[in-house]
Amino acid sequence: SLFMLMKEIYPPAYSHFWTDNGAWYLNSQYCKENILKELLEEKADYYFIFYNNEIVGNFRILWDENLKGVCAEKQVKLHRLYLHQKIQGKGIGKKLVFWLEEKARENNYQTIWLDAMNEQEQAFQFYKKLGYKYHSHTFLPFNLMYARVRKMNQIYKLLSK
């Protein structure tokens, strides 16, 4: 199940950001009720990432989700991309981002954007290498998350035709 996958993927990377080791986040975002609600959203897609016939990650795409201040009519948000540690560094994330960029272009989207945790510098550098630029930041409203790690960088890429 998605919940079991996230219980394996999320804690090694993020448990130290939380007073409860991320249990509240996992239970609220990946409980059956929330997943069913998100699956019913009209302009959202959920994907599992497979590697060697094993599920190693997941992500969401939110179509027509706009980042304020970006002058592009059609925008798409890459939301909650998580990869298992054992396959990081194998180029899977890069292939996934390129796949999403191509899918967005095919559907006439001009911009892809996402939130990247300020405390996860390697993630920001990964997207920067792929041409994504800093736009602004926001703060997560999660009370069980330590205040010093709530900053999210909003980054984007304008897509060429």
Can you say where each PLM-predicted feature lies in the sequence?
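Conserved GNAT acetyl-CoA-binding A-motif
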Residues: 97, 104-116
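Conserved catalytic-core motifs of GNAT/GCN5-like acyltransferases
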Residues: 113-116, 128-150
